[in-house]
């Protein structure tokens, strides 16, 4: 199983796992960040929801050996297997014995593919951005998602005609959010514990870098340091990799939409809508002083 964060909100439904990482409310306006684990093959469906800010583990970044071993030990299957028919919905499920036989063959195929990928890696010395693609049908993906608007997602993905695996993901997300109590703050900082201190400027480095990794931990598996997180923050900033900056947000209110957030403005939005770096730095310092 892919490494993931767990806490009191962690909910498992089928092959989907949902955990609330940060949950913030101010003047009745709520913003929530979840860490998700789900089958890689439904990721394209999840990506169609444009009100979400997302970061995800990448097949181009994870070592071949690690991906192959995950498939060997715990290959992804299907939560529901239906008989073929016209249309997008399989109304009738296979009998349990046939379903078990199919899933056993499916997972065996994945394990055989993982062994083949390991062989190719040694034989040809091919990069992970190529070989990991062969493992995606049996792989999980870890995704960080932040949003203020969830109703349309739940309406579509909890509907009876949604693919069962994304139904289970939506159910896990809904249950995790229902089990979470938001903290009251003007700052939303995923992967930063604000229960014991007020937001600080260095929290921004931690939050952006950990959102980029989709983890509290660095690549070595230990909790990241301020030096590591600041270095990654600056590299992302200098190279224009702005997506991790979308998960950090401040309450701006006025019943306005700030990009895809209602009443909350993301750090990315701040950077992209201010004219020079000095103004951005001064503005961000003010945000943390006023929080």
List the model feature ranges, each with a label.
Residues 1-291:
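A conserved ligand/cofactor-binding region detector
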């Amino acid at each position: 199983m892919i490494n993931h964060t767990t806490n009191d909100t962690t909910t498992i439904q089928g092959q989907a796992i949902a955990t609330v990482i940060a949950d913030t409310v101010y003047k009745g306006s709520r913003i929530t960040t979840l860490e998700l684990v789900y089958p890689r093959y439904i990721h394209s469906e999840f990506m169609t929801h444009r009100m979400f800010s997302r970061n995800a583990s990448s097949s181009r970044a994870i070592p071949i050996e690690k991906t192959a071993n995950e498939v060997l030990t715990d290959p992804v299957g299907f939560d529901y297997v239906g008989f073929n028919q016209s249309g997008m919905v399989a109304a009738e499920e296979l009998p349990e014995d046939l379903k078990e036989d199919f899933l056993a063959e499916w997972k065996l195929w994945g394990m055989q593919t993982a062994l083949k990928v390991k062989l190719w890696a040694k034989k040809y010395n091919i990069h992970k951005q190529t070989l990991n693609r062969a493992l995606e049908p049996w792989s999980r993906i870890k995704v960080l998602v932040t949003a203020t608007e969830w109703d349309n997602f739940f309406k579509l993905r909890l509907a009876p005609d949604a693919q069962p695996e994304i139904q289970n993901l939506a159910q896990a997300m809904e249950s995790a959010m229902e089990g979470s109590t938001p903290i009251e703050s003007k700052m939303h900082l995923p992967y930063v514990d604000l229960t014991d201190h007020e937001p600080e400027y260095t929290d921004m480095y931690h939050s952006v870098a950990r959102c980029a990794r989709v983890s509290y931990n660095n690549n070595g598996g230990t909790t990241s340091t301020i030096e590591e997180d600041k270095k990654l923050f600056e590299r992302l900033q200098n190279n224009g990799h702005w997506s991790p900056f979308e998960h950090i947000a401040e309450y701006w209110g006025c019943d306005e939409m700030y990009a895809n957030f209602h009443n909350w403005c993301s750090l990315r939005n701040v950077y992209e809508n201010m004219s020079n770096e000095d103004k951005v730095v001064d503005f961000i310092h003010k945000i943390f002083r006023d929080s």
